[in-house]
């Protein structure tokens, strides 16, 4: 959106093929934009078949894309069912929530230009038995990863060790750090929005660095 309020399409296809259903997006301070494109929610007659872009010119989804500052689009990494995205405070790691059928958080290591140089499973949420899936994903200012999952919002330290689960009256779907000090957690659940004050603020959005702001 420009100063006049005009909305423009940033990217509408990959190599001539339509996206499946872009889901989440995050911006790096180097100008790269990352977004997820899951699959499996198209009409049956639009499911992929062998070919460069599948039936009805649809890609099969299940990818994390990287949009470079010059407009070049590439596949950063394939993923079973990529959903939420978050960047570590130093922006060297991109976290990806994998929703179905395996419930993981992937950690993608990035070089200075924002290309993938390594990848690993950061956390395994498959052992949870309560309602909830990896979807909303955020990082706080000391690098801890917050992710919706079975039972609530999972809080995981930078080494991948589970610290605990923040529980809510109903299933958590997505959330954000907000307020003047980024110490209020706003959580969207199935029927309501909840708030919780936390001791450690959320990590400021990377674009604040370009503007010389801290919150």
Language-model regions, residue ranges each:
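Short loop/turn segments immediately following beta-strands, especially the blade-tip
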Residues: 107-115, 197-205
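A short, acidic, flexible beta-alpha connecting loop/helix-capping segment that sits on the rim
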Residues: 170-172, 181, 189-194, 199-202
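Conserved beta-strand positions in repeat-built beta-propeller and related beta-rich domains
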Residues: 1, 33-39, 94-100, 144-150, ...
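Structural signal for beta-propeller blades
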Residues: 41-43, 62-64, 102-105, 153-154, ...
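Predominantly five- to eight-bladed beta-propeller fold
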Residues: 47-63, 199-215
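Beta-rich, blade/repeat-based domains predominating
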Residues: 15-33, 58-63, 74-93, 125-150, ...
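Blade-edge beta-strand/turn elements of extracellular beta-propeller
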Residues: 2-16, 61-81, 109-129, 153-168
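Asp-box/WD-like beta-propeller blade repeats and closely related beta-sheet repeat scaffolds
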Residues: 1-53, 58-61
């Amino acid at each position: 959106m420009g100063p006049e309020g005009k909305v423009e399409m940033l990217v509408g296809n990959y190599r001539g093929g339509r996206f499946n259903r872009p889901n989440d997006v995050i911006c790096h301070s180097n100008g790269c934009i990352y977004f997820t494109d899951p699959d499996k929610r198209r009409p049956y007659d639009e499911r992929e078949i062998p070919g460069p872009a599948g039936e009805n010119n649809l890609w099969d989804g299940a990818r994390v894309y990287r949009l470079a500052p010059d407009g070049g689009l590439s596949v950063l990494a394939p993923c079973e069912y990529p959903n939420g995205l978050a960047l570590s405070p130093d922006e060297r790691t991109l976290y990806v929530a994998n929703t179905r059928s395996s419930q993981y958080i992937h950690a993608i290591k990035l070089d200075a230009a924002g290309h993938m140089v390594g990848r690993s499973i950061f956390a395994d949420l498959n052992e949870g038995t309560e309602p909830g899936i990896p979807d909303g994903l955020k990082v706080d200012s000391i690098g801890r990863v917050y992710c919706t999952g079975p039972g609530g919002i999972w809080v995981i330290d930078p080494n991948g060790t589970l610290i605990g689960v923040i529980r809510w009256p109903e299933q958590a779907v997505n959330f954000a750090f907000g307020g003047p000090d980024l110490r209020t957690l706003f959580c969207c659940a199935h029927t309501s929005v909840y708030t919780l004050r936390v001791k450690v603020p959320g990590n400021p959005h990377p674009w604040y660095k370009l503007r010389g702001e801290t919150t």
